A protein has these predicted regions:
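Acidic, Mg2+-coordinating phosphoryl-transfer loop and its flanking beta/alpha structural elements
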Residues: 21
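ATP/NTP-dependent adenylation/nucleotidyl-transfer catalytic domains that generate, transfer
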Residues: 1, 5-8, 13-16, 24, ...
Length: 273
């Protein structure tokens, strides 16, 4: 979407695209990226960032934390982190899901130490990608366009100094459902318009609602709009076909994430001289 808007504003010759897969990336993501770039007629490059991540210890640090929880984890295994709690009440917590080479899955609640290490290690991916973004921006004397939508930006679903860094963020005021609608309006390929939002960070398939949000994005958009427009939990419950208690839980989760991630968008603290 951001690439398409950039082309409309500046023309295809002034837009440059980057596809930055690594060894855990889905091949579908790279293929959709190529399809979009070719549809828009922009120049693009593909860089495999796996060697850089390997050198930084991204995979090693992640796997060490996983093995402290699942000692059998090793070569050929797959993984992802999922959030538990949702709208059913109680405190949200994270679980590690692993799959053996034979296809058997198991899940285990993640202790805080291991959760933080896994997330810190995987955040290398977004930060290395942003380093590549700014290398090419400097090389071309271009600006870096950020991609967070309103839901992601409001709820802190980005990595500080990673995918959260950009010179402009043209869709940060748009709900995710609006982004999809605009993509269809602009005639972007069906593979883009129909793609399910995914973090594409872990080796097992993972939707954004599994990892971070309490509900699928279409429902989260409604909830965020309702909260910002002063609608009661009872009104939200009717719209989302859930109980008022569940709707209140969604509101509480939105507010909690705002508090917990406020620092991500904060400017550095400057001390008086």
């Amino acid at each position: 979407m951001c690439a398409a808007l950039s082309v409309r504003a500046l023309g295809a010759k002034k837009v440059f695209g980057l596809l930055l897969p690594e060894r855990d990336s889905s091949g579908f993501s790279t293929e959709r990226g190529r399809q979009l770039a070719e549809h828009l007629g922009i120049e693009y490059q593909v860089h495999d960032i796996a060697p850089a991540l390997e050198a930084l210890g991204c995979y090693q640090q992640r796997d060490e934390a996983i093995r402290r929880v699942v000692p059998a984890y090793g070569e050929g295994w797959k993984n992802k982190i999922v959030i538990a709690g949702g709208v059913e009440g109680g405190i949200n917590f994270f679980k590690l899901v692993v799959q053996s080479p034979g296809g058997e899955q198991q899940s285990v609640r993640l202790p805080l130490r291991e959760y933080l290490q896994i997330v810190a290690a995987t955040n290398f991916k977004q930060r290395v990608r942003k380093t590549m973004d700014y290398y090419h921006a400097d090389r071309l004397n271009y600006a870096v366009v950020g991609t967070p939508n309103r839901l992601e930006y409001d709820q802190g679903f980005f990595v500080k100094n990673g995918d959260g860094s950009a010179d402009l963020k043209p869709i940060a005021h748009l709900y995710k459902t609006q982004v999809y609608a605009m993509a269809r309006h602009l005639g972007l390929p069906d593979a883009i318009c129909n793609a399910v939002p995914t973090t594409d960070t872990y080796t097992l398939p993972q939707g954004q609602d599994e990892f971070y949000f309490a509900l699928p994005y279409a429902q989260m958009d409604i909830a965020l709009w309702a909260l910002e427009h002063g609608r009661s939990a009872e009104e939200l419950a009717v719209a989302l076909k859930m109980t008022p208690a569940q709707a209140q839980r969604v509101y509480d989760d939105i507010r909690a994430k705002r508090r917990a991630t406020e620092y991500l968008a904060a400017a550095p603290e400057l001390l008086p001289g």
